[in-house]
Amino acid sequence: MSNERYNARESEPKWQAKWDEAKIFATRNDDPRPKYYVLEMFPYPSGRIHMGHVRNYTMGDVVARTMRARGHNVLHPMGWDAFGLPAENAAIERKVAPKAWTYANIAAMKKQLQTMGLSLDWAREFATCDPTYYKHQQKMFLDFLKAGLAERETRKLNWDPVDMTVLANEQVIDGRGWRSGAVVEQREMNQWVFKITRYAQELLDALETLDRWPDKVRLMQRNWIGRSEGLLVRFALDSATTPAGETELKIFTTRPDTLFGAKFMAIAADHPLAQAAAAKDPKIAAFVEDCKKRGTAQAEIDTAEKLGIDTGIRALHPFDPNWQIPVYVANFVLMEYGTGAIFGCPAHDQRDLDFVNKYQLGNTPVVCPEGQDPSSFVITDEAYDGDGRLINSRFLDGMSIAEAKEDVAKRLETATLGNAPVGERKVNFRLRDWGISRQRYWGCPIPVIHCEVCGVVPVPDKDLPVVLPEDVSFDKPGNALDHHPTWKHTACPQCGAKATRETDTMDTFVDSSWYFARFTDPWNENAPTTPDVVNRMLPVDQYIGGVEHAILHLLYSRFFTRAMKATGHVGLDEPFRGMFTQGMVVHETYRKADGMFASPAEVAIVAEGDGRRATLLDDGTPIEIGPIEKMSKSKRNTVDPDDIIGSYGADTARWFMLSDSPPDRDVIWSEEGVKGASRFVQRLWRMINDAAEIAKAAPAARPDAFGPEALAVRKAAHGALDKVLSGIERLAFNVSLAHIREFSNSLGEALARPGAASPDVAPDLAWAIREGAVILVQLFHPMMPHLAEECWAALGQPGLVSEALWPQIERDLLLEDSITLPVQVNGKKRGEVTVARDANNPEIEAAVLALDAVRQALDGKPVRKVIVVPQRIVNVVG
């Protein structure tokens, strides 16, 4: 065996320079080969890449390199999702301009990514904060505006009075701003929205076509869109208890079958009826104000205590005008969902049951499980939401749920209240239009001008881009664009009067909703896309990113692609053909006696009995080994990719990230695992060098025949080719790596055989070893490209392995020498027989009739005939 060590520090920069010089990863848009577009979600330039980036981008690179070797014109670009609040926070905390901070981070992270050896087309690189990028985003905004897909509307929004900005629902925690801690106010504000709801049904239906997306992601989007079929019911209000002018209360329900179980109505705090009641009762007014201070995120509403206050208003049951139902203002009803009002049937909804138990409103079960005695069926603390038959429901009694729903719908459709039907079948969606206005500086400016004469005026195309000013100050809270002395002041493009620019900027999700399309031709200065190019290169064949983006980013991108199609920028509906969500990189946590966390670099781990013990490196103080958690700065359980690449090399880091666990699951970072990957790198290097020596004795031409030893090597090599490729195509990278290890063991055994390293080695074996070594290098090239290039050169192969085509698999070599066939006697399986693959019928018959199971089944009866279905089955007829 060769004793020369592989030196990653020397090898990796050398090959990266050669790739760059040869421009082998640059993609030509006019390349006639079939295209393959692989894309990992582009990063936010925070300043440092982390191990999650290493895993994510390594996966994409394996796919890109493999598809390139398979003869495709691969597009594998990289850019930067560069707008966002962290840059403004840095400006406030570090007194550095957002632009300078962002571009410095981009430079640092690009350098880090380049050390990984990724096969990226850096010529297509852009940042979303480049005016040359957001110019086209502004153009599309104006196109959407013309098409009615962008509108300005008044919405109730979460307003942080200290930071002076709108907060998303998820940023309101216990009624306070996540950053300032200030009590959040509900304000009606003008907001720019994209009309995603126009595509709600289409976005839902098209999920069925995305068969290369994870089921969990499709389910999350399906639930977020939230289609529900139900009935819009108009409840008359009792005039004696209702404020003047209010006559009815509309609710949308998916369970009209449970109307006879209604015990209360609940309305949102900002429902007009609640406002009318609050105007007359200080207690109701105080409760309404308290509701407005609470978070409106669904997760917070689901977990908060369900509270309400009786308005004194009474609604009349649609089937019984003498049945009055109390109307409550409740903290779990939101105005933006449905009609902002519900009816509560506590026996069959847990939230409603918790509510009535708190306020002692009682419950009446109206659906009884099959087989249960209706007279004894009661509900106490647990609602029943299963199937059954209707009870306590007058004319609905005995019906199934489906029958009762239909009966109620028909009756209420024909009943009237005023001049309109009491009931109307409706389809409702949970999805709401996408509010894109943000009161921030570091975002894409919204290209409209506000004129007192003309109103809202689009910025003319010739004046795009509307560029952010750089001389901004963050000394005051709120949006720096509002405080700028000159930027927002302009002239109206239509009448020339004094006017002001829109100072809201776009949600950063807009920036990432079309970047994949821009990558197809980022040099086009005149339009967001080049139609013939974008329609040829899209959709993205394989998109890779975290499951945390399953809803917003992926759903917004699906909408945006449709909006781009409607405005002539693309010719397709779905942006991503295949979607893969990788697991996280996790690590143990280490906690010191004072409760503070220690980083892995500060800790020594030693085995102790059946367990392990951790101490601080600097003074030997024992510390607690905590749970394995996602790498995070707060837990200090991060590992710096630069340290790993500097110590072991990029290929070792890449290999470890792929080898230890299925790619859709979390990978546990361990120093021992990395060391094991490093040892494997060295083993491969020695093995290929030994094979290169033997290959010198190989004939140039393929031998006419191969002996058993050579044939075994060739079978192992071509079997690995087939299995490794299959694993990569299924994104089962850990499976592919296991097959590479398996084949390396087979090749290692061949190299270790007596005589293999001899000058007199058999020509057929030398040829097979050379072929096997070349195949092995091509197999691990997508995962460890630097080592592969070094090994490729050691084997004397021409050019770069990064440009080599995938070897042709010889299918004959995948066939086993023997085959196992099921054996039936008179049509009933009795056993199996293993015979040579090329055995003839008489040989198969003899082997079958010699089986004890066959003789026992025949029980002395003569054999009438033996039917052999080649390569399939044998049937004995007795």
From Swiss-Prot:
MF terms (GO), sorted A to Z: aminoacyl-tRNA deacylase activity; ATP binding; leucine-tRNA ligase activity
Motif ('HIGH' region): 43-53
Tagged with keyword ATP-binding: yes
CDD domains xref list: Anticodon_Ia_Leu_BEm, LeuRS_core
Location of the motif 'KMSKS' region: 630-634
A cellular-component GO term for this protein: cytosol
An annotated GO BP: leucyl-tRNA aminoacylation
Binding site for ATP: K633
Disulfide bonds: none
InterPro entries: aa-tRNA-synth_I_CS (IPR001412), aa-tRNA-synth_Ia (IPR002300), Leu-tRNA-ligase (IPR002302), Leu_tRNA-synth_edit (IPR025709), M/V/L/I-tRNA-synth_anticd-bd (IPR013155), Methionyl/Leucyl_tRNA_Synth (IPR015413), Rossmann-like_a/b/a_fold (IPR014729), tRNAsynth_Ia_anticodon-bd (IPR009080)
UniProt catalytic activity: tRNA(Leu) + L-leucine + ATP = L-leucyl-tRNA(Leu) + AMP + diphosphate
Gene3D superfamilies xref list: 2.20.28.290, 3.10.20.590, HUPs, Isoleucyl-tRNA Synthetase, Domain 1
Enzyme class (EC, first level): ligase
EC number: 6.1.1.4
Keyword Metal-binding: no
Pfam families: Anticodon_1 (PF08264), tRNA-synt_1 (PF00133), tRNA-synt_1_2 (PF13603), tRNA-synt_1g (PF09334)
Protein name: Leucine--tRNA ligase
